A protein has these predicted regions:
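Class I S-adenosyl-L-methionine-dependent methyltransferase catalytic core
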Residues: 1-204
């Protein structure tokens, strides 16, 4: 599947019915999701692999991984309503994904997920709660040797420092995350946020 075809396939995926600001629930746009997934595919980290999506929301990354030939896809989110929507989205595209309602901070989750080959995720940026992305990073590095994650542009140095003993940043790809007016505190119809996709390789 080519990048443009992947983007078009992911475009109809529905976002949150009742987004929650505290969880920074913004639908990952299809172009950005496709870019992350296609990059991972080209690196050999999707097809035939066991893939985990942490903080899956309504499932765009997990569903995309399944459509790109992942052997097994497991996706986690703490919001039952989001997972309900993700299940519906997966069914509509005939994508097989195992969705789990759980908090990434749950000590039992690593055992439940077991190990996987690749983590894909778009964690909270920390706009509502500082360092909200850290539990996602910690879990990702504990269960997979390779992680692809979307962060605010300029986060690479912090991530490099935070994960210095555990992982190294292998690649960085820039992108744009258009955030539509969703909550009462938004002042623009659309605000384009510069982001970066980081590929983290766990140290042996």
């Amino acid at each position: 599947m080519k990048l443009k075809h992947l983007e078009m396939t992911l475009q109809p995926i529905r976002g949150y019915y009742h987004p929650r600001a505290a969880l920074e629930q913004y639908q990952t746009p299809a172009p950005l999701a496709a870019r992350l997934l296609y990059h991972a595919l080209m690196k050999g980290d999707i097809e035939g692999k066991t893939v985990c999506d942490l903080g899956c929301g309504t499932g765009v990354l997990a569903i995309g991984a399944a459509l790109l030939g992942a052997d097994r896809v497991r996706a986690v989110d703490c919001d039952p309503k989001a997972v309900e929507g993700a299940n519906a989205n997966a069914a509509q595209l005939d994508a097989h994904v195992e969705f789990i309602v759980a908090d990434v901070r749950d000590d039992a989750l690593p055992g439940l997920l077991e190990s996987c080959d690749t983590v894909i995720m778009n964690p909270p940026f920390g706009a509502q709660k500082a360092h909200a992305d850290r539990p996602f990073i910690d879990l990702a590095l504990s269960i997979a040797p390779v992680t692809y994650s979307i962060f605010n542009a300029g986060s690479a140095q912090f991530i490099k420092t935070y994960t210095a003993q555990r992982a190294e940043i292998d690649e960085k790809v820039g992108g744009i995350f258009p955030i539509k007016r969703t909550f009462s505190f938004h002042t623009h119809d659309v605000q384009e946020i510069e982001v970066e996709i980081l590929r983290l390789i766990r140290k042996q």
